[in-house]
Amino acid sequence: DKKGVFQWYFKRRVDEGGYKISQDYTFDQEAGEVFTQKEETHEVPMGVQDMVSAFYFARTFDFSDIQKGDVFEIPTFVDDELFNLRIKFQGRETIKIRNGKFKAMKFVPLVQEGRIWKDENDLNVWISDDDNKIPLLAKTKILFGSIKMELTEYSGLAHKISKVR
């Protein structure tokens, strides 16, 4: 979108061991509304995101003056409701993943307890400390185990990556 990083459509399909979710949201950013497949209309603020686009949107922020402990919020529409996704900056560090060592910024998205997570601090995300701001690593504890996601390759970046030699 030429006006900004706006969400226009979201589709979610989950089928895990009998647990099923089917969600379709159409966002009308100018009118400030979200339309659901249940034919419900929800009032939302301009620039609202969904659970996936919120993380892409966060990559557009200027983190040059961010301080450890700073929290920023992104209005997010999830599971037929609006909430402010709060993301806490934990600091800068060098991390090692299979692809090498990188200068990174660590963030903790303050997640909703009880659905998947025991504690609101159970998700940790590291993004490259450069103008690309690509996700390098994510770790989370969930009610029935843990998940780890790691960058395995990258190409076509607009800027030099923060890889440590």
Placement of each model-derived feature along the sequence:
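Hydrophobic, well-structured mid-protein blocks that either form specific transmembrane helices
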Residues: 19-63
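Acidic, serine/threonine-rich low-complexity disordered tracts
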Residues: 1-27, 63-165
